[in-house]
Design a protein with these regions (language model features):
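N-terminal helix-turn-helix DNA-binding core of bacterial DNA-binding proteins
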Residues: 23-67, 91-98
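Short, hydrophobic-biased segments on the C-terminal half of alpha helices
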Residues: 73-74
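N-terminal leader segment of winged-helix/HTH proteins
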Residues: 1-36
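Beta-hairpin "wing" of winged helix-turn-helix
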Residues: 77-87, 94
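Short, solvent-exposed amphipathic helices
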Residues: 99-113
């Protein structure tokens, strides 16, 4: 369908408006994507993509202090992107579910494709 056809299709704009998420959902999506906008948080998520680890190990992998990793993990946990589980004196962090991994994988695939 050509661009002119879309602009002239009766009801097109109204349907698109109806299909748009509500303002609260848009704000939640905006907040979610903001979390991916921080390079340290993004490194943490990518490090956890292949399995969980404790804060000390994450700190070494990501290359920032333990306190910086802990601070970012708190934000990621609040946003339901990571979860923790205690194993004795250690706390292991992992991605919450396959949706988080899928978001990361799709973004990486998009980057690899480059411009069209």
């Amino acid at each position: 369908m050509a661009a002119d056809d879309v602009c002239r299709t009766e009801g097109f704009v109204e349907k698109r408006i109806r299909d748009m998420p509500d303002d609260d959902t848009i704000m939640e999506l905006s907040d979610l994507f903001k979390l991916f906008g921080d390079s340290t948080r993004l490194r943490i998520l990518l490090a956890l993509k292949d399995g969980g680890m404790c804060v000390d190990t994450l700190s070494s992998v990501v290359g920032v202090s333990v306190s910086a990793v802990s601070h970012q993990l708190k934000s990621l946990k609040t946003a339901n992107l990571v979860r923790s589980r205690r194993d004795g004196k250690w706390v292991h962090y992992e991605l919450c579910d396959e949706h988080v991994e899928a978001l990361l994988s799709i973004a990486m695939e998009h980057l690899r494709e480059g411009p069209e």
